[in-house]
């Protein structure tokens, strides 16, 4: 896998090193939060965010094994997996500046909306863009059986097409057929 034009940690080294690096980054984050004179609300927001992102990632992995998921399930998953990370970051910034509770909530909700928009756009770009532009591998979601927003919309338009598509073994061909279907059915404008 490629992210921002570079190999991911698990690709460059291995999965164990990637997990260890993630654990180390978490420990550093917690040290920064607990060593500073931050209000408990900031640490609470961080911990809640961390758990929520883990739950979202678990749902994403679970959905790989499911044949179909609903739009509601998808939106719940991306809210937890992607949106919550952005919302938590904004919320912590708002708490650091000691904004009132109402404004903190507005900022958090703004982060949720930005996160959903980002993830849906990223899902479409994975199919409709190219590796050079995106600076990341674009077939990983297809290979892993991820339930992305374009896949969900394609399923809603024609479930038989998606079943036939998954029988194709060539990932490049799958992406070509998906692009064609998305454009023909005007799915990218929904």
PLM features: residue spans?
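All-alpha prenyltransferase/terpene-synthase fold signal
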Residues: 1-190
